[in-house]
Amino acid sequence: MEPGFWHEKWQQQLIGFHQQDINPFLVKYWQTLALPADAKVFVPLCGKSLDMCFLAEQGHQVIGCELNELAVQQFFEENQLPMNQSAEGEHQHYQTEQVSLYQGDIFTLPQSITAQVNGFYDRAALIAWPESMRTQYAKQLAQLLPSGSVGLLVTLDYPQETLSGPPFAVSPTWVETHLSDDFEIQALACQDVLADNPRFVKKEVPWLNEAVYLLRRK
């Protein structure tokens, strides 16, 4: 997935991956992490997700990383949040009281930015990568997260041959095989969400499972 792919999606507003509501798994399971209210929470490939507003409402300091400039600007505009912008190395830093977004490549994000995070939340990042690049992303995420940090991972799984991603299918087996070296993994829930996703129904995908995992960085 080249950067130009995502820039084009945002430019044309072909952003079906953007959810208009807060993710139900986030609302239901976030408190199981037992993070302090003032915890710092990292959100990779954050887009303009409303989930960040939910995290900020819990009292957390949200640190996001997003490739596309338009996505970051729309987050602050649509939520009517005043922000300051500054250059920080290769990234542009957009900051408001509880949300700091770094616009740029997650693979060049300095580890110092996430060195103090307590938690993390990945809903649309892992599933954005084809299998050929997914392990590289997972290793980068692990490198950015301090030992002991806890978070939620939300995945989608379906017969990959029935639809070209993104989002790409990520099975429980893939999660266990490729993340267990760096994370303790606890599966929390899994449900069929096919009826809520017309694109998958139209393509006659037989099933679509959304799963949520609790991850703890080793």
Curated annotation (Swiss-Prot):
Name of the protein: Thiopurine S-methyltransferase
Family matches, as PROSITE patterns: SAM_MT_TPMT
The reaction(s) this protein catalyses: S-adenosyl-L-methionine + a thiopurine = S-adenosyl-L-homocysteine + a thiopurine S-methylether
Main location: cytoplasm
Entry EC no(s): 2.1.1.67
Entries under HAMAP family matching the protein: Thiopur_methtran
Superkingdom of the source species: Bacteria
GO molecular function terms listed in the Swiss-Prot or TrEMBL record: thiopurine S-methyltransferase activity
UniProt record, GO biological process: methylation; response to metal ion
Keyword S-adenosyl-L-methionine: yes
Family to which this protein belongs: Belongs to the class I-like SAM-binding methyltransferase superfamily. TPMT family.
The keyword S-adenosyl-L-methionine belongs to this UniProt entry's keyword annotation: yes
Organism field: Shewanella sp. (strain MR-4)
Entry keyword set: Cytoplasm, Methyltransferase, S-adenosyl-L-methionine, Transferase
Cellular compartment(s): Cytoplasm
InterPro entries membership: SAM-dependent_MTases_sf, Thiopur_S-MeTfrase_Se/Te_detox, Thiopurine_S-MeTrfase, TPMT
One Pfam entry name: TPMT
